[in-house]
């Protein structure tokens, strides 16, 4: 991914006119929701890393975020605890210093499986990105029963390099299902069984936007959400985009837009807790990172 080396933040989304792959987009309507988390550079949960990478909600609505030094790497995995049952301006609290984890690679996306191969909860991080950091490995991060970060293992995928990965425990009639994505290709995998085999390419011409970079994806019982960020080839007036597909890769809603704010704000990932959706934006100019609601 051609990244803007910047400071992360998370913004809400806005919807635009549906378009075909690689077609120019029209102006979108901002669908930004309320801020739920603000992450300044001084936060202990980022350990001096300035770039927000993958993000996912885990057990009990805890939030896990990868921060890195951009092309310099040195990723860390941070954990944020839910602060009560009310969604407000401080919905998560930093659990302390993050874990240095070189095996995360680029850490472009995070998925959460509450019972990975029957062995309990785990995060799954993509080591690769769209093109700048190609890698077909993913890193399994085992979690304790309380969501604490534990041991890791690396798994090689037969799909080749992927940039986005998600898991839904409620998909496939409750059997669970994975989705993986890179550019126009979408693969799925049953919820059970090793990730080293069993993948199916379900579509090779997904709708997405030109002059944008692959970022994280999220999935639920019936849908998959894909994020495309601004990059160094995007016009100054360009937007970030989210696309909603069904599990066959068919369009449900296209060009859900997030303002790029003159190439300041770069979407990185999308995740949900129950019916609440959140997006993560990496920002330039020393601005604090933020997690905000996606209003549907």
Segments predicted by a language model, with ranges:
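A short beta-strand motif characteristic of beta-propeller blades
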Residues: 33-46, 88-101, 150-157, 197-208, ...
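Repeated scaffold domains used in trafficking and secretory/extracellular systems
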Residues: 47-57, 102-115, 156-172, 209-219, ...
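Blade-loop segments of beta-propeller domains
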Residues: 85-127
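Short beta-strand elements that form the blades of beta-propeller/WD-repeat-like
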Residues: 61-69, 118-132, 172-182, 222-234, ...
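Loop/turn-rich, solvent-exposed surfaces of beta-rich toroidal or solenoidal domains
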Residues: 207-247
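Beta-strand-rich domains and repeat architectures in extracellular enzymes and scaffolds
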Residues: 41-75, 106-109
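Structural motif
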Residues: 71-83, 130-142, 183-192, 232-244, ...
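Secretory targeting and sorting signals
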Residues: 1-27
């Amino acid at each position: 991914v051609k990244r803007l080396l910047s400071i992360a933040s998370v913004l809400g989304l806005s919807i635009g006119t549906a378009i075909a792959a690689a077609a120019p987009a029209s102006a979108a309507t901002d669908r930004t929701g309320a801020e739920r988390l603000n992450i300044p550079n001084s936060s202990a949960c980022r350990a001096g890393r300035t770039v927000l990478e993958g993000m996912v909600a885990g057990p009990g609505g805890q939030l896990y975020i990868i921060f890195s030094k951009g092309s310099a790497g040195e990723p860390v995995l941070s954990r944020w605890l839910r602060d009560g049952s009310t969604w407000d301006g401080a919905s998560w609290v930093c659990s302390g210093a993050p874990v240095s984890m070189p095996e995360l690679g680029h850490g472009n996306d995070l998925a959460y499986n509450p019972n990975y191969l029957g062995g309990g909860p785990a995060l799954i991080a993509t080591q690769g990105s769209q093109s700048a950091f190609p890698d077909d490995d993913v890193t399994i991060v085992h979690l304790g029963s309380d969501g604490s970060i534990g041991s890791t293992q690396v798994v090689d995928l037969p799909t080749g390099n992927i940039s986005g990965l998600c898991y839904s425990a409620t998909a496939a009639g409750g059997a669970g299902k994975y989705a993986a994505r890179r550019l126009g290709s979408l693969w799925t995998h049953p919820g059970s069984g090793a990730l080293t085999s069993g993948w199916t390419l379900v579509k090779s011409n997904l709708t997405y936007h030109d002059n944008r970079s692959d970022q994280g994806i999220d999935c639920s019982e019936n849908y998959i959400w894909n994020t495309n960020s601004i990059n160094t080839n995007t016009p100054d007036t360009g937007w970030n985009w989210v696309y909603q597909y069904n599990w066959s890769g068919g369009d449900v809603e296209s060009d859900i837009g997030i303002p790029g704010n003159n190439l300041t704000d770069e979407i990185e990932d999308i995740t949900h807790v129950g019916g609440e959706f959140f997006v993560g934006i990496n920002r330039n100019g020393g601005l604090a990172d933020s997690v905000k609601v996606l209003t549907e």
